[in-house]
């Protein structure tokens, strides 16, 4: 499309673009295509196919499709990673939470150029999901209570080192060990390592070689 001379742009129709999408053999090709085609060819169907096939294609969505309706359609097609590339002010908290909840906690979520979540996304459900995924840095400190950290270590045991001293207790450490004993064990404070603590470790079989 980049190489097509202007005098041949008349051949560019939705059907032509859809044919190109359906016959594309390059994973990144879906993203590149949406980047270069004229805005008038970025129809709902074209954009939907491109974004389903490559989550980063949402960077090139026209404004008319940067909304919950389009994002929910992506979720229905099991494309959840798009949230890494959208403008976060274009999505509501319920839809954002819905996408987050579908992503495997073992998968990393890369929020590009985002230092903190916008205020409208800081709902109880979103904060829980961010903790579950270990995305602590994007949540303001005021929202990080004991339950936030407990949720985080239950899914990401390696995050035990990020738990403030005031929240560090037996329950917190055991939860981290259950999630990832190998990573969590080195962050357990000496004051927690009592005979009663080790008894619980043995009972729960929370060992790591």
Regions found by a protein language model. Give the residues of each.
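Ankyrin repeat (ANK) tandem alpha-helical domains that serve as protein-protein interaction scaffolds
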Residues: 1-209
């Amino acid at each position: 499309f980049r190489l097509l001379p202007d005098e041949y742009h008349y051949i560019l129709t939705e059907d032509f673009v859809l044919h190109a999408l359906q016959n594309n053999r390059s994973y990144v090709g879906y993203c590149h295509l949406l980047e270069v085609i004229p805005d008038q060819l970025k129809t709902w169907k074209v954009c939907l196919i491109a974004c389903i096939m490559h989550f980063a294609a949402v960077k090139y969505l026209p404004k008319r499709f940067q909304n919950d309706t389009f994002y929910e359609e992506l979720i229905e097609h099991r494309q959840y990673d798009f949230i890494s590339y959208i403008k976060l002010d274009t999505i509501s908290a319920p839809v954002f939470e819905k996408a987050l909840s579908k992503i495997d906690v073992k998968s990393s979520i890369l929020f590009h150029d985002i230092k903190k979540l916008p205020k409208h996304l800081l709902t109880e459900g979103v904060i829980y999901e961010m903790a579950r995924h270990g995305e602590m840095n994007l949540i303001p400190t005021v929202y990080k209570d004991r339950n936030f950290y407990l949720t985080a270590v239950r899914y990401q045991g390696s995050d035990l080192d990020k738990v403030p001293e005031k929240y560090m207790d037996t329950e917190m450490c055991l939860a981290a060990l259950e999630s990832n004993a190998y990573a969590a064990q080195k962050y357990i404070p000496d004051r927690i390592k009592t005979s009663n603590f080790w008894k619980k470790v043995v009972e729960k079989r929370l060992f790591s070689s």
